[in-house]
């Protein structure tokens, strides 16, 4: 009896510890651009829908440009972090641009501060993230990072729909199929070497379908879609479940208004709830892109989208995380 009580006590401590480290609305900071239409409206709408405390919502002044200079960005970031409550552990950035700080993504620059070593000069690797495949979620307290996700606000209708999807997915267990697509592009197909491991490790939790060619029919059950091409020709055939994630390994996906390659925001317009793309040349290092296995390992253990996506990228300096950060389809975090 005594042993059983002790075991129960240990279990409760583990559960309590897990809940203490999970991301909640109370720990999410919401930043919007005072100088851009829709930014404030979307931020306030999001805070209301997610019941985020008003003290967590902060307006800042940002130039409405694609890329902000590191010199202009540094004081803006510092002033914002100084004004947010000390309980904040993650950020949502409610604007569409700037999406880059120099050659870093704006989400990574807010997370770690602008650091030149995060920018690849030529085809080089960049520093590892201390959050990669990590346990718990107290990044500010443990490593001094403020992981961020961009919630694009230029199209207010899309922003509201994105918020709806994220909330609608909560605690649904997200039934559906994870699609892993091989392509004929040898560089952009770099993640395919790990697809077999994804299927092996996740098949007991969801349907995982590895394809040697893009889908050639309409699919209505996508909870994830990972590929490697400059333009996703099959995009109109893809219909995503609320809470789904999708991205394509290519150089310029994070350039949200780009035309030479498909911008990552196209995934959101098609129905995904979160996506990812790089804002400067990554040279197809797989470490600079999301690892589907790591992402869904954390996602299916009850972590939020922002936690799961951030933990899936080893070298995130050039990568832009985009979507609704608090979506949690698989319920509360399990220890």
Predicted regions and their residues:
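N-terminal secretory signal peptides that target proteins for export/translocation
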Residues: 1-3
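Cysteine-dependent hydrolase recognition
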Residues: 21-335
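Bacterial N-terminal signal peptides
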Residues: 6-17
């Amino acid at each position: 009896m005594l042993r059983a009580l002790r075991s129960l006590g240990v279990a409760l401590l583990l559960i309590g510890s897990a809940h203490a480290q999970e991301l909640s609305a109370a720990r999410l900071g919401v930043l919007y651009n005072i100088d851009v239409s829709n930014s404030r409206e979307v931020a306030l709408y999001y805070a209301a829908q997610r019941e985020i405390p008003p003290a967590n919502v902060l307006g800042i002044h940002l130039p409405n440009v694609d890329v902000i200079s590191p010199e202009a960005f540094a004081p803006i970031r510092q002033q914002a972090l100084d004004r947010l409550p000390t309980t904040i552990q993650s950020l949502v950035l409610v604007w569409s641009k700037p999406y880059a700080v120099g050659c870093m993504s704006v989400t990574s620059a807010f997370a770690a501060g602008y650091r030149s070593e995060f920018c690849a000069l030529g085809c080089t690797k960049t520093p590892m993230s201390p959050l990669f495949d990590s346990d718990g979620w107290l990044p500010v307290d443990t490593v001094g990072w403020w992981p961020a996700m961009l919630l694009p606000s230029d199209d207010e209708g899309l922003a509201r729909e994105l918020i709806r999807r994220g909330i609608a997915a909560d605690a649904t267990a997200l039934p559906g199929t994870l699609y892993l697509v091989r392509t004929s592009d040898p560089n952009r197909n770099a993640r395919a070497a790990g697809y077999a491991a994804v299927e092996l490790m996740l098949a007991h939790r969801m349907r995982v379908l590895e394809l040697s060619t893009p889908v050639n029919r309409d699919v209505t059950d996508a909870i994830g879609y990972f590929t490697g091409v400059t333009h996703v020709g099959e995009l109109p055939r893809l219909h995503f479940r609320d809470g789904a994630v999708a991205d394509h390994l290519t150089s310029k996906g994070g350039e949200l208004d780009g035309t030479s390659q498909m911008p990552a925001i196209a995934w959101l317009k098609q129905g995904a709830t979160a996506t990812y793309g790089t804002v400067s040349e990554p040279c197809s290092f797989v470490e600079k892109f999301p690892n589907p296995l790591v992402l869904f390992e954390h996602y299916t253990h009850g972590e939020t989208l922002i936690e799961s996506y951030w933990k899936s990228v080893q070298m995130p300096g050039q990568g832009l995380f985009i979507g609704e950060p608090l979506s949690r389809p698989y319920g509360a975090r399990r220890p």
